[in-house]
Amino acid sequence: MKAFIVRVLLIFIGAILFIQLWIFSSLVWWRTHEVDTTMFMRIDYWSDTSEPIIHEWLDYDDISDNFKHAILAGEDAKFIHHHGFDWDGIRFALERNNEQGEVVAGGSTVSQQLAKNLFLYNKRSFIRKGQETVATWMMERMWSKRRILEVYMNSVEFGKNLYGVEAAAQYYYGKSAKNLTREQAAFLAALLPDPKYYQDHRNDRKLQYRKRVILRYMNSTQIPE
């Protein structure tokens, strides 16, 4: 019995180490190569294979600065200054969730969201959150802020099977993300809390309010050079 328990523990530890090695090697590769697909994209596609994934990579310098400012205003205003975790944001989210008695605020940074999208599944659990923390820690030490934001903008979801700002700009406005105006950039950034819903409800009051807030604060955000 003791030998069996030891064997199970060794297998469990080996699996954990293998996952960390996979994440580490992937981050090394993606430092200099485009991210063609993410775990989030694959899971989304496997759940409904009737429609293809729409995704097109665009280099950082070819993405409108309007969108860079908008996405940080909407998702992570302290992106430049933290090391992967916004402790004030996490504390605020916990307080709001406690007040409401349910999860109404997240507090995840761009880095945390990207780590989850690249490697993990969407269902909340302590195991997933722990692995997200480890992957975020690795990413922040291996990639520049510029690279993190570049990959995030190219992999985040904007609607059903619609990923990356270039695909979103073409879908919603028929233009490249390089040419997004302030209004257009703010709208795309405002979609992110629930892109599949807002894709078909573009005049939703919450969406329009979020867009106005992003427009108000986007010029105050600092983006990587």
From Swiss-Prot:
The chain crosses the membrane at residues 8-28. The lineage of its organism: Bacteria, Pseudomonadati, Pseudomonadota, Gammaproteobacteria, Moraxellales. It is found in: Cell inner membrane. The keyword Cytoplasm does not apply. GO terms for cellular component: peptidoglycan-based cell wall; plasma membrane. It is a single-pass membrane protein. GO terms for biological process: cell wall organization; peptidoglycan biosynthetic process; regulation of cell shape. It is an enzyme of class 2 (transferase). Pathway: Cell wall biogenesis; peptidoglycan biosynthesis. It catalyses: [GlcNAc-(1->4)-Mur2Ac(oyl-L-Ala-gamma-D-Glu-L-Lys-D-Ala-D-Ala)](n)-di-trans,octa-cis-undecaprenyl diphosphate + beta-D-GlcNAc-(1->4)-Mur2Ac(oyl-L-Ala-gamma-D-Glu-L-Lys-D-Ala-D-Ala)-di-trans,octa-cis-undecaprenyl diphosphate = [GlcNAc-(1->4)-Mur2Ac(oyl-L-Ala-gamma-D-Glu-L-Lys-D-Ala-D-Ala)](n+1)-di-trans,octa-cis-undecaprenyl diphosphate + di-trans,octa-cis-undecaprenyl diphosphate + H(+). PANTHER family: BIOSYNTHETIC PEPTIDOGLYCAN TRANSGLYCOSYLASE, MONOFUNCTIONAL BIOSYNTHETIC PEPTIDOGLYCAN TRANSGLYCOSYLASE. This is Biosynthetic peptidoglycan transglycosylase. Belongs to the glycosyltransferase 51 family. It comes from the Bacteria. It holds the Pfam family Transgly. Its main location: membrane. GO terms for molecular function: pentosyltransferase activity; peptidoglycan glycosyltransferase activity. Keywords: Cell inner membrane, Cell membrane, Cell shape, Cell wall biogenesis/degradation, Glycosyltransferase, Membrane, Peptidoglycan synthesis, Transferase, Transmembrane, Transmembrane helix. Its EC number is 2.4.99.28. InterPro entries: Glyco_trans_51, Lysozyme-like_dom_sf, PBP_transglycosylase, Pep_trsgly. It comes from Acinetobacter baumannii (strain ATCC 17978 / DSM 105126 / CIP 53.77 / LMG 1025 / NCDC KC755 / 5377).
